[in-house]
């Protein structure tokens, strides 16, 4: 067991270092930060649809009609919009981050060596997944500064449990997509094809609840449960939904399992 953990950590470090040394990965991170900052300002300060504009409009209506209305929960509304936007942006970024996990190895001819090594296939897959998930966490970590600025002026103080659950949901969402993308990457030596197929799969899992709404009976209900958007929305609303946690965990383990089986097939072919 100790050897297994040592192998996972070694692969994890190698994978993480490769991302920080990759110009493409760093360029993606820079673009992600730039776009996220733009949306942060837009969500708060847009003169027509920004949250602060909504607060001002609500105050004007109350003053004109003289009828009190429940005040707009600015931190909560901001968190919903911001984390929803970050998740939508991640939909385009995550397939690019996962596309080279195995496709690059296959392209360079090192995947055959990896497949015939004495290291367990699931160990390699787990180490690679942890590496890319950690890189994604470093990408979203600076966004906490935006949220801290917003929450610092909240009266009364905004409870920390809601943003914590929201970020847990974002990490689980990313890990699910990256795990499934890792499996797709193990099937081809084309990083571009891997990214396209992963994006198509994620898009399906993103909008499957819309498809389920038009499918009657148990099949529609089953499809609705597969939606990563619906389950992510539960967490960013501060709702601890065990079924959502189970779904994300299932996607993560499914991706690792299928990746291990894909490499095992290659190992069998080599033998």
In which residue ranges do the predicted regions lie?
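Transmembrane helix boundary and interhelical loop/hinge segments in multi-pass membrane proteins
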Residues: 95-115, 129
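Secretory targeting signals
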Residues: 38-41, 70-83, 126-189, 240, ...
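Hydrophobic/aromatic residues in alpha-helical transmembrane segments
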Residues: 94-98, 110, 146, 179-180, ...
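Long, hydrophobic alpha-helical segments
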Residues: 74, 78-104, 139
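Hydrophobic alpha-helical transmembrane segments of multi-pass membrane transport/permease proteins
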Residues: 23-53, 88-93, 200-204
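Aromatic- and glycine-rich beta-strand/loop motifs that create alpha-glucan
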Residues: 1-29
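Terminal transmembrane helical anchor/hairpin motif
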Residues: 5, 43-76, 194-262, 266-270
């Amino acid at each position: 067991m100790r050897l297994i953990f040592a192998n996972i950590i070694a692969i994890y470090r190698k994978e993480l270092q490769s991302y920080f040394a990759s110009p493409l990965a760093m360029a993606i991170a820079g673009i992600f930060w730039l776009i996220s900052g733009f949306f942060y300002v837009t969500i708060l300060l847009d003169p027509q649809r920004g949250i602060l504009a909504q607060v001002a409009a609500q105050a004007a209506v109350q003053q004109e009609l003289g009828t009190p209305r429940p005040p707009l929960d600015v931190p909560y509304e901001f968190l919903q919009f911001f984390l929803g936007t970050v998740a939508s942006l991640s939909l385009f970024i995550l397939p690019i981050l996962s596309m080279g996990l195995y496709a690059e190895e296959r392209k360079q001819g090192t995947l055959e060596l990896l497949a015939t090594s004495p290291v367990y296939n699931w160990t390699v897959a787990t180490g690679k997944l942890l590496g890319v998930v950690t890189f994604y966490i470093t990408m979203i970590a600076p966004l906490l500064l935006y949220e801290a600025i917003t929450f610092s002026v909240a009266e009364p103080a905004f409870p920390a449990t809601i943003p914590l659950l929201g970020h847990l949901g974002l990490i689980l969402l990313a890990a699910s997509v990256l795990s499934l993308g890792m499996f797709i990457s193990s099937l081809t030596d084309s990083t571009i094809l891997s990214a396209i197929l992963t994006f198509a799969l994620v898009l399906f899992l993103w909008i499957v609840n819309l498809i389920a709404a038009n499918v009657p009976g148990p099949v529609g209900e089953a499809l609705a449960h597969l939606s990563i958007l619906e389950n992510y929305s539960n967490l960013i609303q501060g709702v601890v939904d065990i079924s959502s946690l189970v779904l994300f965990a299932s996607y993560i383990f499914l991706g690792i399992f299928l990746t291990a089986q894909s490499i095992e097939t290659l190992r069998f072919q080599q033998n």
